Amino acid sequence: MMRGSRFLLSRASLYHRLRSDHHHHSFSSFIKRSSIQRSPAINAFFTDPSPSPSPVNARVFFFSTSTSTPNQDQTKTASSKKILRTISSYLWMKDNPELRFRVIAALACLIGAKFLNVQVPFLFKLSIDLLSSYSSSTITDSNPYLLAAFATPSSVLIGYGIARSGSSAFNELRTAVFSKVSLRTIRSVSRKVLSHLHDLDLRYHLNRETGALNRIIDRGSRAINTILSAMVFNVVPTILEISMVTGILAYNFGPVFALITSLSVGSYIAFTLVVTQYRTKFRKAMNQADNDASTRAIDSLVNYETVKYFNNEDYEARKYDDLLGRYEDAALQTQKSLAFLDFGQSFIFSTALSTSMVLCSQGIMNGEMTVGDLVMVNGLLFQLSLPLYFLGGVYRETVQGLVDMKSLFQLLEERSDIGDKDTETKLPPLVLRGGSISFENVHFSYLPERKILDGISFEVPAGKSVAIVGSSGSGKSTILRMIFRFFDTDSGNVRIDGQDIKEVTLESLRSCIGVVPQDTVLFNDTIFHNIHYGNLSATEEEVYDAARRAVIHDTIMKFPDKYSTAVGERGLMLSGGEKQRVALARAFLKSPAILLCDEATNALDSKTEAEIMKTFRSLASNRTCIFIAHRLTTAMQCDEIIVMEKGKVVEKGTHQVLLEKSGRYAKLWTQQNSTLEV
């Protein structure tokens, strides 16, 4: 019989590992992992990471040997409760009756599965006693159950099979019914995260690491399913099943068996808590190495051309391999500690099972118990082993899910420095009365020690065009970012038609401004989509007209797929001039009241530039335009030219007036003409 017990224990362990592998493969569709990582059950505990030097504002994992202070512990508890409250709200969506019905149906399937599962050891005991008995009277005496009065071994064994199959069917049905709830939750949270990231200011996105951010979002989204499943189908049912088994053993076989069960469960849980706490640092190291490797790979691929220019393929591979080595080392430590954890859990359960079997065998020899009783005790303990194994795994996965969710929630708690003010009354929209722009003693710096704008003041009259020229780093592009409110001033004001842009809604401000950036990055989609993006309500003919005004229509029509041509990652399938003209077409399609162009023609040849400047002049009619101009031939066609140097306005006037002053602009003009002559 002990061989049978060991066999059952082995089955429990195998079943547990198969389920772990199943979870791992279901998650692999979201994100690829190194093969050394076995399953989400390789785990970490929920701790409150200290700030990291990462540019993602420490929104990545790290490892530390420092201990937590009481305040940190309170923060961790509060964070865990907040996460669980948020996840719980998705279980019972008040505005979605279908999902609420699915939760109720899944719980009903859970109850049905547990009810049938409890019948299995009873039916198995009865069949053993029936087969061990030689007369119906003996059968009835040894089995004081109503079923024993009319049962036959075959019918009981058929019932045994039905109970096992029914329990499995209810479990699978529960999974199928509940899957839409978890998937809808993942969808809702993922959309919320993306929307929140778009709401954050430019400063945050300039400092972030795309690879690490992608990992945080992926792991956080996957953790939602883990935590939801644990809350509904693992934690409470496991506690219920442990209580039921302990009660049945105490009622049928005495308090000794109940005591053995209680001690083994307590030891199992305590051992799992202690060892998993120790394993926290390894999982955090894995997360950090995973983030770093992902960031390195993405950065290397994004800069594919630069890598090729300098023949640094081997260097990139070595750097990536070094980070993978860090991940491998941390994963190896995780695997070793997991093996120790699994062995300890198996040892505790094996000890409890062996002790119970010895007591049963003594009871049989003393005539106090039947062979069926031994089988029933074995079955109940084996039945208890599965939730115990799952309790450890679910606990580890849930805690790891909390770690991943906390990082995701920290991302959601990021607040933008740029946005509509939090006031009791909503900010009014911008009221356009022509589109005049004024800077009033504006100071700004990206870093305290580096001044970008140093008290600049100027005005662009409504419907006029102004060119801003100057050497690199003089603050020209920053001015455009200030107008669009990518950044706010350190002091001073920026006004449009006399209205402080901080005192109007961002949506109304940005809806009336068109921007052609210096570095044009296109979506990995068709040319039509990239132009149409400027005004999603525009018709096809309006898109074609915008392309004609940007002098790109004829070029597009020569492509095999015409407007359906894919531009590739970041528009790399197009030349620099083609990308810039697509960006111009996009701005033309928006047809804004204010147009901001940051060296919009610097990648164009002289002929194309002349054609586009004609279009600009027609577009600029009755519109306020600001051009950041590297080519002074572009600047000379504007109504006024502003010359900047070291964050200050040093000259203002028309092209002819500035040439007559023989100042900074005149020198720039002479330098460019000399270069052209050479």
From Swiss-Prot:
Sorted alphabetically, which keywords does the UniProt record give?
A: ATP-binding, Ion transport, Iron, Iron transport, Membrane, Mitochondrion, Mitochondrion inner membrane, Nucleotide-binding, Transit peptide, Transmembrane, Transmembrane helix, Transport
| Gene null: resulting phenotype | No visible phenotype.
Tell me which Gene Ontology terms the entry assigns under biological process: intracellular iron ion homeostasis; iron ion transport; response to cadmium ion
Feature: transit peptide: 1-63
**What range(s) does the ABC transporter domain occupy?**
437-671
**Domain ABC transmembrane type-1: where?**
103-400
Record-linked SUPFAM superfamilies: ABC transporter transmembrane region, P-loop containing nucleoside triphosphate hydrolases
- Judging by the UniProt lineage, the source's domain of life is Eukaryota
Q: In which tissues is it expressed?
A: Expressed in roots, leaves, stems, flowers and siliques.
The way this protein sits in the membrane is described as: Multi-pass membrane protein
Where is this protein primarily located? mitochondrion
GO annotations of cellular component type:
mitochondrial inner membrane; mitochondrion
What Gene Ontology molecular-function terms does this entry list? ABC-type transporter activity; ATP binding; ATP hydrolysis activity
Q: Which residues cross the membrane?
A: 104-124, 143-163, 230-250, 255-275, 338-358, 374-394
Question: Do you know which InterPro entries this protein is assigned to?
Answer: AAA+_ATPase (IPR003593), ABC1_TM_dom (IPR011527), ABC1_TM_sf (IPR036640), ABC_transporter-like_ATP-bd (IPR003439), ABC_transporter-like_CS (IPR017871), P-loop_NTPase (IPR027417), Type_1_exporter (IPR039421)
- Which family, according to the similarity comment? Belongs to the ABC transporter superfamily. ABCB family. Heavy Metal importer (TC 3.A.1.210) subfamily.
Q: What does this protein do?
A: Performs an essential function in the generation of cytoplasmic iron-sulfur proteins by mediating export of Fe/S cluster precursors synthesized by NFS1 and other mitochondrial proteins. Not involved in the export of cyclic pyranopterin monophosphate (cPMP) from mitochondria into the cytosol.
Subunit text: Homodimer.
Q: Which PANTHER family match?
A: ABC TRANSPORTER B FAMILY MEMBER 23, MITOCHONDRIAL-RELATED, ATP-BINDING CASSETTE SUB-FAMILY B
From the Swiss-Prot or TrEMBL record, give the protein name: ABC transporter B family member 23, mitochondrial
Q: Which organism is it from?
A: Arabidopsis thaliana (Mouse-ear cress)
Identify the taxonomic lineage of the organism of origin. Eukaryota, Viridiplantae, Streptophyta, Embryophyta, Tracheophyta
Gene it is expressed from:
ABCB23
